[in-house]
């Protein structure tokens, strides 16, 4: 990892566009690799394996199909924000909003919330590094957290997005290859996938791991997929890459192939976590985050198992560097006084953010899944105002502020007073945390529309989106795919099918294939216009 980090620092420019956006030069294949490596983080490896340990295979469609379908919103939003980014010289969402609305208040509000939302997600990475270090060497978690933080900060400070993208390519390949090696080892030790699934289904204590009843309600299922759809494009590090894309066609190719990468990334940790319940049936919520390294070390021994655990390090490093760079750009370009010395600001901000994330990872007792869901809910609230600002030229900055404050107020209420949701909604606690996204998005959208109407309707403002006739069919097809993914007709189904997996797993995979086909046709038509 150290050698690759040094190699990645070649031919780097020092201007902001080169440092933060790699000169807007990311082509389709590179964009796909860096988006995937950045998005598939410690949450992917340790959070998803821990969650599947607790709730079983129902977490696979939620993550693999759900994050794969998120590419649709990336494509719809990405083309417009890339254009606005070039138009305004913007490198962050708040900068784009400032360019469109002329409101410094809107810029400051959005940037502040994005930075606050990123801190708990940033803490996931050193938390996971500590897990790997402890599994490999038996020392305290905090040592691994500190060492990995130091390495990531070092090459991010000196390299910018070009260095991050180069390390993403290497780290992504390492993570994916070694995760599949780890899965092969665990499955072989269990006697094969079918044998492992049969053992799970034949025990009263584990049979619920092959079903959804008791693990999800339909509302939680739908809410979680909605959360991914609206939250992921608002991740500062993913938004930054959309701005850095070479063309709309590059974004289209990335969005088309993203579902395949999502399935490849989530199958290993989720299957390992589920199978791990056979060997370690009594882990608590926080302890279940360790199930993947524990299983791999058990079946692979210290050397081979340790090699596979490098996959976790590669995944978390490829996300942490991107988070530091993107969040640093929010602070230096949106929050700090423009008169501050540019290079000093970059370095001090990135170091400060890394220390905040490190501190939260060491002293917080929240699980990796808890930290991730908190950050995702805060991100999702940004989507309506960013989408509106990108598509309309006369959005009022006060409407953006109202939208953000209204939505985040609901998120804060969900965190500190979940009982307030009883009686009219679902208490957003534990597995039901994602349900907060629907009322928070409703509040955000209401704040945007009502405030915009109050200040702008007398000037003839219209909410009418311009949609090409050729876009209607693919949009309708993708909507059908999303609705079909909420397969309530198989909700109580636990009967296993091919490879011992429930049929609703295969159904979700088939829907991702359908999504890919629709996207390929749509992107091809748009590119030929």
Give the ranges of each region predicted by the language model:
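Membrane-embedded helix-loop-helix hairpins and adjacent transmembrane boundary segments
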Residues: 1-495, 501-502, 508-512, 516-525, ...
């Amino acid at each position: 990892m150290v050698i690759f980090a040094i190699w990645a620092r070649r031919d780097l420019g020092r201007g902001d566009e080169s440092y933060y956006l790699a000169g807007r030069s990311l082509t389709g294949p590179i964009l796909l690799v860096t988006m995937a490596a950045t998005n598939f983080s410690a949450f992917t490896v340790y959070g998803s394996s821990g969650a599947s340990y607790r709730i079983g295979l129902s977490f696979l469609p939620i993550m693999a199909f759900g994050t794969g379908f998120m590419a649709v919103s990336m494509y719809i939003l990405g083309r417009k924000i890339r254009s606005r980014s070039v138009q305004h010289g913007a490198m962050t969402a708040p900068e784009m909003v400032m360019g469109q609305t002329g409101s410094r208040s809107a810029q400051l509000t959005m940037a502040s919330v994005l930075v606050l939302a990123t801190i708990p997600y940033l803490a996931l990475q050193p938390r996971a590094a500590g897990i790997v270090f402890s599994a490999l060497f038996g020392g305290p978690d905090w040592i691994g957290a500190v060492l990995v933080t130091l390495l990531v900060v070092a090459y991010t400070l000196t390299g910018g997005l070009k260095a991050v993208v180069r390390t993403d390519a290497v780290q992504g390949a390492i993570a994916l290859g070694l995760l599949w090696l780890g899965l092969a080892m665990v499955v072989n030790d269990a006697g094969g996938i079918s044998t492992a699934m049969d053992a799970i289904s034949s025990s009263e204590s584990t049979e619920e791991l092959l079903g959804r009843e008791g693990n999800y309600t339909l509302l939680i299922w739908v809410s979680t997929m909605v959360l991914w759809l609206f939250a992921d494009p608002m991740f500062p590090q993913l938004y930054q890459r959309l701005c850095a894309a070479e063309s709309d066609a590059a974004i289209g190719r990335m969005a088309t192939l993203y579902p395949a990468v999502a399935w490849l990334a989530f199958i290993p940790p989720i299957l390992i976590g589920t199978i791990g319940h056979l060997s370690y049936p009594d882990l608590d919520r926080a302890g279940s985050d360790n199930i993947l390294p524990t299983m791999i070390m058990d079946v692979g021994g210290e050397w081979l198992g340790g090699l596979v655990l490098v996959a976790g390090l590669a995944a978390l490093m490829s996300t942490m560097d991107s988070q530091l760079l993107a969040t640093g750009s929010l602070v230096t370009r949106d929050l700090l006084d423009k008169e501050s010395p540019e290079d000093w600001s970059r370095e001090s901000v990135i170091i400060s953010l890394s220390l905040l994330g490190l501190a939260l990872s060491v002293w917080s007792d929240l699980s990796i899944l808890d930290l991730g869901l908190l950050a995702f809910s805060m991100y999702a609230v940004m989507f309506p105002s960013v989408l509106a600002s990108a598509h309309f030229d006369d959005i009022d900055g006060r409407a953006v502020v109202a939208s953000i404050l209204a939505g985040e107020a609901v998120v804060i209420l969900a965190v500190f007073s979940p009982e307030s949701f009883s009686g009219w909604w679902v208490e957003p606690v534990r597995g039901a945390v994602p349900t907060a996204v629907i009322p928070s998005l409703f509040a955000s959208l209401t704040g945007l529309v009502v405030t915009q109407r109050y200040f702008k309707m007398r000037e003839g403002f219209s909410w009418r989106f311009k949609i090409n006739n050729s876009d209607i069919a693919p949009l309708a097809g993708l909507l059908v795919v999303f609705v079909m993914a909420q397969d309530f007709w198989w909700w109580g189904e636990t009967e296993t099918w091919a490879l011992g997996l429930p049929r609703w797993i295969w159904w979700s995979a088939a829907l991702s294939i359908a999504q890919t086909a629709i996207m390929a046709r749509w992107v091809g038509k748009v590119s030929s216009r």
